A protein has these predicted regions:
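Feature for intrinsically disordered/low-complexity regulatory segments and propeptides
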Residues: 1-115
Length: 116
């Protein structure tokens, strides 16, 4: 039998996550992706170009949603992410500016978990 979390542990995990989650409704012109090492980080800015939060890591689900939103084929997006993150950042940032929209950025504990 596979063991998992107890009811108490699950409740604690849910409570912890509810305290650490944040959702932001942002214009894509207020977003910027920046490569750092093998990761991409999302920077968020307010209307005065001041950072809203610390740079955020982007999880795999959010990467897929960003690529889908920008109409970048998944295989090409993944190749840029692994082989040439600077090119991916340039592409994403350019499309964010060129075709601005309001998007919800869902975060949990310093990581973008959804781009809706």
């Amino acid at each position: 039998m596979k063991s998992g979390l107890t009811i108490v542990e699950m409740a604690q995990q849910i409570e912890r996550q509810s305290k650490l989650k944040q959702d932001y409704l942002l214009d894509t012109r207020r977003l910027q992706v920046e490569p750092f090492g093998s990761q991409l980080y999302l920077h968020t800015f307010d209307d005065h170009d001041d950072p809203l939060v610390e740079p955020l890591e982007i999880n795999q689900i959010a990467h897929r949603q960003i690529g889908t939103h920008l109409k970048i084929p998944a295989a090409y997006y993944d190749r840029m992410l692994s082989d040439y993150p600077e090119l991916l950042a340039e592409n994403v940032n350019s499309w964010f500016q060129r075709e601005p929209t309001q998007r919800m950025v869902r975060t949990l504990d310093g990581t973008v978990r959804a781009f809706l």
